[in-house]
Amino acid sequence: MNPTITEHDFRFPRRPAAPGRDPGSDSSDDPLPASLRELNSDRQSAFNDAQNKLARTEAFEDLRNGMARVKDTPELLQEQDPLAAQVWRFFSKTKTMLPNQERMENLTWRMMHVNLRKRQQEESARISSPPLKTNAPSGIAQQLRQTPTQKKSSAGEMSLDDFIDSSHGSATSGLASSSPEAGKPDSTSTNAISSAIPINKSRKNEVAAQSQFNPQSVPAAAQRGRMDNEFGYLKRHHRKTSIDDRKTTRKRPRGCSPFQVPSIVTDTLSNDLDADAGFNDYTLDSTNGINVSQPMTTNGRSPFTIDAFNVPSEPMIHSAGPYQQNFSFSPSTSPMASNGFPQHMFNGQSITNSLANPDLYSPPGSAYQSQVSTPHPMNENGDGSFFFGNGMDVRHQRSHSFRQPSATQNMQTQPFSYNGNGGGGFFPQSMASNGMSSSYATSGNTFGHIDPAQVFQNEQTAQSPGFNMMQENNAFNFGGHSDDEEDGGVFADRNLALSSEFSPGAMDEPAVDFGTNPMGWDATLPGNFSTQAARYPAGPPRRQNTIGGMPSEFGEKNGDYAEGGLARSQSQSFHGNQADARRRIPRNASTTAIPNSQMQYEQQGVQGHTNSPPADMANGHTSGFSSVVHSRPSSPPPGSKNGSTTNLQQQGNNQGGDAPTTCTNCATQTTPLWRRNPEGQPLCNACGLFLKLHGVVRPLSLKTDVIKKRNRGSGSNVPGATSGSRSKKGATSTAVSGTNTRKNSSLAISRTASTTNVQVAPTPAIAPAASQSRAGSANEGESPMSGGGNTAGSTPTSHNSGGSVAVGGKGVVPIAAAPPKNMPGPGAAAAARTVALGPKRQRRHSKPSPANASLIGMNNANHSDAMEVDSPENSTGSNEAATRPSGFGTTATSASFAGLTSNSFGMSASTRSMITPGMLGGGMSTSALSSTGGLLSSGSAAATVPQEWDWLTMSL
């Protein structure tokens, strides 16, 4: 008895359990419990009611025809929801008003049909695809199951490996053709069947097949197997390229030469391919690339009997070597060529002391003109210029067998990273024993590494050796520092690149003291004494001639660099009085003359590297010119400021980083168009065109000649005119505004009571009395201050008068020296011959003080053949000057160049003294001195007024 029934009070009627059922009959045949039956009955009744009421057509009579007659509905709906009624009305009205209602509907159905059709096709394709999968064995697997002969026929005529293998005879054609497939049949067929196919099995088969291949085809096969098997567990869907996949292993004929000639040598190309044995050494990694190189001979020559231009000993090529060191691959060996070039060609240890590669290759933070090019450390012996050991002198190609610098011996033993021999450096030491040019064989190789920070200091324009062709050693000494122009330029023959082999070993020794030699000019020496001294990583200093007992480029005995192969590293350490002597800064290839170079060294403590140019301690910075040509200004007197700037670019009165662009060849700063040499260094238009047209650097001698032709057209070229023109240039006005004056362009020499203080006042004051000396920057001392003083355009009123002379246009001076003026008698004032020189080029030619002018005139009078104002000797330092007698004896007392008196040179009026900027304390350019033609006569003691000498080369 069901408890629910018993508990129910029959007095109360119950709901019908189900439609058409009476309450009493439900329990008999309904399998559900009473409670569930009751719930079910309720649900059923609700369903029936909904069905009866909602299914009536009259309820939705208006909707029966697709809402075509909905016009009454909006009112009905509006009662309930006016907004909905409005929307409905709009919708229905729009629907009914569509002109192409049926067509729209048809289009909708058609679109739907297209979609459905696509879907149906996809479904059918999906359904049909499984049979393809099941038939996969008949695809690739079926081909794999074919007999070798069948495979051979079906392999395809384009399968190159089949021919290669059969011709090579390494395997039968059947094997060759099947080998790529050997592993795949199982993997592919089984993959089609099940994803659990053992990959190893296919791998084994593939490896077995590969073993039968030519080694050359193995690499591709191995890679192919690796690729296929790695993902072999994936089912391979039917592919159009399934057969091609079978042949991909043989699709690489490049490495499959039947001759088994290794196309490239690399052992790192593929890690696991035995075939790569053919590619023995291909690698961009220095680990293999450099080590692969042939063993280097101790002398650094190429292991082959070939003497490739003595490349191992070529400084230029060697300089490239250390840079290569950081390259991922050695440039000497092409990644594609095994052991191609002699490694030392580029790996020469000769530049053991080269800067770090990135430092050399990336322009320093302040890219000076010269620094733009890769600085190649110059050999300390001063011999190596970037191009062929010595400048562009190709004659220097042979190794310098004459002197085998001990430095080379030391270099071998030293553990430089680049030292191929002792240091175990990457690059074999190319200059081991072949007497390599001392340029890279520094005795002791004192600086194994140059601190790029030192080399590239913004204020110190270490001239990048890249343009060493301009360096002193160059066959053509192009516009060395203009102040030293006479040294190198005049004696161009000395500038010819004499390989260090010719330079006496003593020159490389730091102990050599040229101070004892008042002139310090040793004709036997190459144009630059310290061939390597000032060659900081940037390059050798321009002038190494010792002037007035001051070795311009030689390291001091007591200098920090005195010991070891840095003999010249302190290129211009001066042995003279450090206090008074105006030291010429050791010039890098590009450093401008800076006073007190020795003191700079001492103060700087060798700036960390002999190669790194010392910062100008006195002036606070070295010249800003980075052009290979040293910023021509000679070192200003120690006390003077670096105020003078070239008239051309007037970079502000500092020689520092803003120095005007200077032609690395001729040192000119005035040119209508700046060009660049292959090193990226600035060249004037003339030098650039010459180099472009002739392929060789333009000799300074040509420059001088050209200048004469161009600028001297208006003046008489009488020998005496030199005094006049010089007088004109060196008008008594000592004060020329420093801004207009070019560095080193003029030297203000004032003789004070006991010591001649070369002080140039930047102020444009009219020339002070003869006794008055200008206080000014050292540079100004070097360059005349344009101002009240006579300009080239104006003629000094009287050369002898100590009074100031009114001057014409300020600093307006033609590029060339003013046309020669009438030569005043020795005591006579220079004829006031005003040559109207167009201010075409603002050049401030220094005007000598009247007294000096008179002296000059006297000197010129005595020497009718005295140099013309801008004679090649004067401006460019042509060899003419060398021929001129230089009767120049400096008295010991006047040896100090801090004070430079006319008497200090002990020059007789008759003798034409060769005065170099170094003698004048670097304040005066040698050309200026020489141009004065015996700058000071013995009577010049009277000339107390500072004299400014501007020589053409300086400005140009």
From Swiss-Prot:
Function: Major nitrogen regulatory protein; activates expression of nitrogen-regulated genes.
Principal cellular location given in the protein's record: nucleus
InterPro entries: AreA_GATA (IPR013860), Transcription_factor_GATA (IPR039355), Znf_GATA (IPR000679), Znf_NHR/GATA (IPR013088)
Entry's Gene Ontology cellular component terms: nucleus
Disordered: region residues: 1-51, 120-222, 240-262, 348-373, 524-661, 708-890
GO molecular function: DNA-binding transcription factor activity, RNA polymerase II-specific; RNA polymerase II cis-regulatory region sequence-specific DNA binding; zinc ion binding
Compositional bias (Low complexity): 15-37, 623-633, 640-661, 812-839
Record-linked PANTHER family: BOX A-BINDING FACTOR-RELATED (PTHR10071:SF281), TRANSCRIPTION FACTOR GATA FAMILY MEMBER (PTHR10071)
Compartmental location: Nucleus
Entries under Gene3D superfamilies matching the protein: Erythroid Transcription Factor GATA-1, subunit A (3.30.50.10)
Amino acid composition bias (Basic and acidic residues), ranges on this chain: 1-12
GO terms for biological process, alphabetical: negative regulation of transcription by RNA polymerase II; nitrate assimilation; positive regulation of transcription by RNA polymerase II
Annotated zinc fingers (GATA-type), start-end: 663-687
Protein name as annotated: Nitrogen regulatory protein NUT1
Segments of skewed composition (Polar residues): 42-51, 131-153, 167-194, 208-217, 588-613, 713-760, 849-863, 872-881
Keyword annotations of the record: Activator, DNA-binding, Metal-binding, Nitrate assimilation, Nucleus, Transcription, Transcription regulation, Zinc, Zinc-finger
